[in-house]
Amino acid sequence: MRMSQLFGQTLREAPADVEVTSHKMLLRAGCIRQLGTGIFSYLPIGWRAVEKISAIIRQEIERIGGQELLMPVVNTADIWKDSGRWDVIGPELTRFKDRQERDLVLAMTHEEAVSDLVRQEIRSYRQLPRLVYHLQTKWRDDPRPRAGLIRVRQFIMKASYSLDRDEALLDLQYDRHFEAYHRIFARCGLDVLAVKSDVGMMGGKVAHEF
């Protein structure tokens, strides 16, 4: 397709209030446009880039045994109340009611939904280990969205959920993911450093950021 036929336009200059270089480049190249605070539309050329990255992620996670699924963006409040995070997480978790006055949430993460699914599908330890993952639209009402796509309220996140018989297998799966992420970054042409980080509300023994 010719550039002249693409939906969306390139910009000679980024808006004056845009400070981060990556944000400026994405706007000027016609990859994204802002709809609201921390909310962006991906134009065709930007979405093609997202799909190429997603394909690399899928290949590398399925290489270590991952099976892709898709979870609902809207979750029932019951599963969040059962986990205790309904009361722990503040206004970042968007809560609302349906027409039947039932409490619902826009999922900012999917541990609760996956746990509910596992209770239905896994009946014996003999079915383990299993590894499921998704590339999912999520919503977190961040109080300070900034820096373009670096810190947004609606975002696409890849998450894996490792179901293991014991902690040793869980540690092995963590190591496999660690290596898979390095391969993903390498295939995207990125040099990265892995830094140990706080586990945060996810819990666990160890976490890394790249």
Where are these regions (language model features)?
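TRNA-recognition modules of translation machinery and tRNA-sensing kinases, especially anticodon-binding
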Residues: 1-209
